[in-house]
Amino acid sequence: FPYTTLFRSKIELNASGGSGYLDNVMSNFPNKDKVITCHNFYPQRYTGLSLEHFNNCNKAMKEYGLHTAAFVSSNNNDTFGPWPVREGLCTLEMHRDMPIDVQAKHLFATGIDDVIIANCYASEEELKALSEINKEMLEFTVELVDGIPEIERKIVLEEFHFNRGDNSEYMARSTQSRVKYKGEKFPPFNTPDIKRGDIIVESDLYTRYAGELQVALKDMKNSGKSNVVARIVEEELFLLDYIEPWTKFSFKLKK
């Protein structure tokens, strides 16, 4: 190869093998601008990476400041990859059979830089769903409760949300809506006991908290003052584990 071609090339390291191999490479002080990493994909069911191992590998990559990539699998009919086994083609075993956009949301939430579809051919619907993902912010798909008032609907779907820094293990609190909508009426209208994944907008009965949006991280007894206004779809509930202090998040309506 011409020298200029080699100079512009990058070396891709296998990100799935653990940190020993990586430590060996990095001990030779390579030009990190020319080093990237990518995880494997796994065509046979039950052979994909565990989340724990995946996270440990990624931690090592990030400590070295290396770019990371991982694979998602299309669930379209008759997809195929480089091997004759056709049981999906993902990096994480837990992603097998998940909607492709949920797989990608999860990878981005873990800090992965690039997401690659491993098998052919993703459907138009899958490609569209992937194109609508916000890499910079957790976005949850939700279903609104029947009869939700317009202000509560607007708070859920249109306002900018971020969790408070003084984090609660029971809920993520987005408090700016109670400031913006101070003086508006928030009568109680739907106050069942609260389940993990429920979206709450506090009612007037909570006085100074009226209008505050909360995301339930655990099941809770409802005092009768908290309006449950929406719920995160079941397949995305595990993404709640990625809400940390100051995490930005948003919601979109299930189609």
Name every feature range the model reports, one short phrase each.
Residues 16-149:
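Catalytic alpha/beta core domains of metabolic enzymes, predominantly
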